[in-house]
From Swiss-Prot:
It comes from Sus scrofa (Pig). GO terms for molecular function: structural molecule activity. Plays a significant role in maintaining keratin filament organization in intestinal epithelia. When phosphorylated, plays a role in the secretion of mucin in the small intestine. This is Keratin, type I cytoskeletal 20. The gene is KRT20. Residues 1-7 are annotated as: Head. Heterotetramer of two type I and two type II keratins. Associates with KRT8. There are two types of cytoskeletal and microfibrillar keratin: I (acidic; 40-55 kDa) and II (neutral to basic; 56-70 kDa). The keyword Coiled coil applies.
Amino acid sequence: GNLWVGNEKMTMKNLNDRLASYLEKVRSLEQSNSKFELQIKQWYESNTPGISRDHSAYLQQIQDLRNQIRDAQLQNARCVLQIDNAKLAAEDFRLKYETERGIRLAV
């Protein structure tokens, strides 16, 4: 029994040491990653002159395009409505024609 307890303690200590080592490596890699990200950002900033991250110049163009899309959707809906109205009118005329034709043939 005591031998097993000693092994458990040793195993737990070993696992804790490995976990601590792993966490230290993760922390070190995160720091390195942050440094690399900063270097990359600085490189892009120094090697892409004149390019800004300000997209406000495009906002009006985006709004204009959205308005064009909305207008096209409205026009499309109007066309669909006109087509439906034309179909109803054609059906109405067909029924009137058949009614008149039936009356004439009956006379």
